[in-house]
């Protein structure tokens, strides 16, 4: 669709392994040209199959990868299991010898200072590759439709989360009730994500089918922030058959 390549798999495990294989190929190609690869990761259960395969990899030189994560709740305790930094630490960052990992500080008192600090880290050199999902409301990172912008200058900012996004965190089993889910977060912006040379988007389950259809079949618009993937020069979307169920009949 437009410039976006799409692959559909019979199972989410097959989807995750295929995404890992392309990720490995991209990283090795990047490493042939540069010393350090700068990689952004999403913290979500949609990424579990991909991250499991990546954590079991024996071919990538992780000592040449600097890691970032794309969003973080504000106001949760620093040790909360739902914190995205903790999620990724457990899933991948502590399991491989990264050159460096840059965490968004979820307990930052001065939000603007934390945004300035993390933006400085992001802009030290070009961003190379991002692995991400799509939310039930079509968001990428925490760029929900009501606040998403394709043209903002900042690469990270504070955002308020819409209730569809917050309910998704309950649906994923991360929180017991909607009221437990934080209402604000820090998120990398769409221009930051789109600046990456390579984009790998991994979207399993039927709960995402409507968002996938909007992403691929609707207009490129902030009403469905993920639709911007169709404008990237090197983006690949990996779906399982449940996530693709509304587009396979088109």
PLM segments and residue spans:
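A glycine- and small-aliphatic-rich helix-loop capping segment at beta-alpha/alpha-beta transitions
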Residues: 52-62, 145-154, 220
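Glycine-rich N-terminal segment of FAD-binding domains in flavoprotein oxidoreductases
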Residues: 28-58
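A glycine-rich beta-strand to alpha-helix segment
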Residues: 36-42, 46, 121-147
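Ligand-binding beta-strand-loop-alpha-helix segment within the catalytic cores
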Residues: 1-3, 62-131
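ATP/nucleoside-binding phosphotransfer catalytic cores, i.e., glycine-rich phosphate-binding loops
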Residues: 188-191, 195-250
């Amino acid at each position: 669709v437009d410039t976006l390549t799409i692959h559909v798999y019979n199972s989410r495990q097959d989807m995750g392994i295929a995404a890992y294989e392309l990720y490995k190929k991209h990283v090795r190609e990047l490493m042939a040209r540069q010393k350090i690869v700068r990689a952004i990761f999403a913290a979500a259960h949609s990424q579990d199959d991909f991250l499991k395969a990546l954590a079991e990899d024996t071919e990538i030189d992780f000592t040449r990868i600097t890691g970032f994560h794309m969003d973080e709740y504000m106001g949760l305790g620093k040790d909360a299991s739902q914190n995205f930094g903790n999620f990724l630490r457990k899933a991948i960052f502590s399991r491989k010898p990264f050159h460096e990992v840059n965490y968004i500080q979820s307990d930052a008192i001065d939000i603007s200072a934390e945004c300035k600090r993390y933006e400085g880290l992001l802009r030290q050199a070009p961003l190379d590759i991002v692995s991400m999902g799509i939310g039930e409301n079509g968001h990428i990172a925490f760029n929900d439709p009501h606040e998403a912008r394709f043209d903002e200058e900042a690469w990270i900012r504070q955002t308020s989360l819409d209730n569809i996004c917050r309910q998704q965190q309950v649906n994923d089993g991360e929180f017991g009730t909607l009221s437990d889910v934080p209402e604000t977060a820090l998120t990398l912006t769409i221009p930051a994500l789109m600046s990456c040379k390579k984009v790998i988007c991994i979207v399993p389950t039927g709960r995402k089918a409507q968002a996938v259809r909007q992403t691929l079949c609707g207009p490129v618009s902030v009403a469905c922030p993920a639709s911007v993937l169709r404008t990237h020069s090197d983006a690949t979307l990996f779906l399982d058959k449940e996530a693709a169920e509304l587009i396979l009949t088109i």
